[in-house]
Amino acid sequence: MPCGEDWLSHPLGIVQGFFAQNGVNPDWEKKVIEYFKEKLKENNAPKWVPSLNEVPLHYLKPNSFVKFRCMIQDMFDPEFYMGIYETVNQNTKARVLHFGKYRDVAECGPQQELDLSSPRSTTSERQTFYCVPVPGESSWVKEAYVNANQARVSPSTSYTPSRHKRSYEDDEDMDLQPSKQKEQHPGSRQAGGLGGLHWCGEPKRLETEASSGQQLNTLNLSSPFDLNFPLPGEKGPACLVKVYEDWDCFKVNDVLELYGVLSVDPVLSVLNSEERDASALLDPMECTDMAEEQRVHSPPASLVPRIHVILAQKLQHINPLLPTCLNKEESRSCQFVSNFMSELSPVRAELLGFLTHALLGDSLAAEYLILHLISTVYTRRDVLPLGKFTVNLSGCPQNSTFTEHLYRIIQHLVPASFRLQMTIENMNQLKLIPHKDYTANRLVSGLLQLPNNTSLVIDETLLEQGQLDTPGVHNVTALSNLITWQKVDYDFSYHQMEFPCNINVLITSEGRSLLPADCQIHLQPQLIPPNMEEYMNGLLSAVLPSVLNKFRIYLTLLRFLDYNLSDDITKAVEDDFVEMRKDDPQSITADDLHQLLVVARFLSLSVGQTTLSRERWLRAKQLELSRKARLQQQKSVNGNEL
């Protein structure tokens, strides 16, 4: 069995070793998973693994061990593949068993031929996910992961082979002319496939089919391939992810960290071209639909590489400054949380000061912004999401770049975010809701296909009078449903499918927002900088990177703290509510009490308290009184408009 660092550069060799030892006994599959799991527990081992998020694809060695941080954008139908297949040597008639797991192309040695009728062959099933880089991931998150990755300096991992000088366009060309790769693949190949796994055979046939396949592929690639990213301007690779175990544990929009075998074999493009060609010959009337589905589900490997997953982990968060898993049972995680909680008070005070400056001197608005940024849906009662705290920051300066720069500040604090400029034109034209394309048999992404814990800033300050058309009304309704119910109804043409979410929504507006909000806070600037960009840039440059990192840890960590109300505290709150109603029955309603409890919850968590104290309850009441008084004052100034 290969040893040393071969698990990084030749993972299939490791798999072959276990398969050779165990044969058809399925225990070899469990041993493979356990082997890589143990390898990744070694000191800093995950940092040695090249990441598709950070390393250009053409630097990575085919069939090497890689990782990928991504979101499941779509799930394709399960596919069958040859789990075990048998080859026969044409000269000696010797028979050899091979594994098909973690492969797209079956490997055959010289003079070997695949025996399709072998009784020892087995068919297995795997699931394919279409995965994209995490939408809206902040640049500081990407930079931190790049800086932490040690794969580039690892002497045992070479991903600058002879391919490293080829351009991106050359990669596409290699897909169209796989015969160029013949020397890199000893043994012979034949373009063909069965049950999701392609096999090898006679080399001469490959060359002739490659030339005919080249023309077909050129036609298919004449229009750019849509990588189906939910947000505009996103970069990074999309991947077809082959999952072999426990795929029922994952769902669309989950954020994953994957470890597996990279497959970028150019032969795949030729094989897929042949399948499209064969479909057209069988039924020309249906060839268009089938070709579109084939194009989407089997894009060129140079554009959409394949990852055969050995290990997959659903991520609680993507903040690189925290342990990946915030597990109470894990000592490292507990130690990290304990150490940070001991310095929570000064971090909160500094963050409050920082946000007060960002909000032009308004400390009350800064308090509510902190509560908003640490809020999260912690449970659902029937259809009602508990813990959401959408804030409408009204009173934003008109004809100013304030909202744009405020969003920049938020981008520097949270791991993932997106700013939606709410104009009539955008509402009428943007595709917010994902929809099913039945021709291509895929889920077409929309702007609201976002992973949990994303910060969505909706900027209404650019909204002017105009007419919403039908798509515009649907988009506004989708935003309202997202805010109220924390769900997005994806369009499947014949029906809508509900996708629950956990998105922090901040609405910036001049007057009261057109959209529903849990809390409206009217901004009262204490200063109006003559140059907003210069002011905000100065604010960011004045904060030490170490302090900024503490803000980032603070805002992520507090979302995962448990919070409970004891029976005594619940009784005290109820009694206080009754007393407030006695003094002025009109001053507080059941909805006001619910709002007060939400504010008290996040206020307690913001200081590291996991239950409600009398001090925090009184502070929450004081904040709410100040906020309402400010709204009332603004109402008297502007009439009914807030």
Curated annotation (Swiss-Prot):
<dbReference type="GO" id="GO:0030054">
    <property type="term" value="C:cell junction"/>
</dbReference>
<feature type="modified residue" description="Phosphothreonine">
    <location>
        <position position="160"/>
    </location>
</feature>
<keyword id="KW-0132">Cell division</keyword>
<keyword id="KW-0498">Mitosis</keyword>
<feature type="modified residue" description="Phosphoserine">
    <location>
        <position position="298"/>
    </location>
</feature>
<feature type="modified residue" description="Phosphoserine">
    <location>
        <position position="154"/>
    </location>
</feature>
<comment type="similarity">
    <text>Belongs to the MCMBP family.</text>
</comment>
<comment type="subunit">
    <text>Interacts with the MCM complex: associates with the MCM3-7 complex which lacks MCM2, while it does not interact with the MCM complex when MCM2 is present (MCM2-7 complex). Interacts with the RPA complex, when composed of all RPA1, RPA2 and RPA3 components, but not with RPA1 or RPA2 alone.</text>
</comment>
<dbReference type="GO" id="GO:0005634">
    <property type="term" value="C:nucleus"/>
</dbReference>
<keyword id="KW-0597">Phosphoprotein</keyword>
<dbReference type="InterPro" id="IPR019140">
    <property type="entry name" value="MCM_complex-bd"/>
</dbReference>
<feature type="modified residue" description="Phosphoserine">
    <location>
        <position position="167"/>
    </location>
</feature>
<dbReference type="GO" id="GO:0005654">
    <property type="term" value="C:nucleoplasm"/>
</dbReference>
<protein>
    <recommendedName>
        <fullName>Mini-chromosome maintenance complex-binding protein</fullName>
    </recommendedName>
</protein>
<comment type="function">
    <text>Associated component of the MCM complex that acts as a regulator of DNA replication. Binds to the MCM complex during late S phase and promotes the disassembly of the MCM complex from chromatin, thereby acting as a key regulator of pre-replication complex (pre-RC) unloading from replicated DNA. Can dissociate the MCM complex without addition of ATP; probably acts by destabilizing interactions of each individual subunits of the MCM complex. Required for sister chromatid cohesion.</text>
</comment>
<feature type="compositionally biased region" description="Polar residues">
    <location>
        <begin position="151"/>
        <end position="161"/>
    </location>
</feature>
<dbReference type="GO" id="GO:0005829">
    <property type="term" value="C:cytosol"/>
</dbReference>
<keyword id="KW-0131">Cell cycle</keyword>
<dbReference type="GO" id="GO:0003682">
    <property type="term" value="F:chromatin binding"/>
</dbReference>
<keyword id="KW-0235">DNA replication</keyword>
<keyword id="KW-0539">Nucleus</keyword>
<dbReference type="GO" id="GO:0042555">
    <property type="term" value="C:MCM complex"/>
</dbReference>
<dbReference type="GO" id="GO:0006261">
    <property type="term" value="P:DNA-templated DNA replication"/>
</dbReference>
<dbReference type="GO" id="GO:0007062">
    <property type="term" value="P:sister chromatid cohesion"/>
</dbReference>
<dbReference type="Pfam" id="PF09739">
    <property type="entry name" value="MCM_bind"/>
</dbReference>
<dbReference type="GO" id="GO:0051301">
    <property type="term" value="P:cell division"/>
</dbReference>
<feature type="region of interest" description="Disordered">
    <location>
        <begin position="151"/>
        <end position="196"/>
    </location>
</feature>
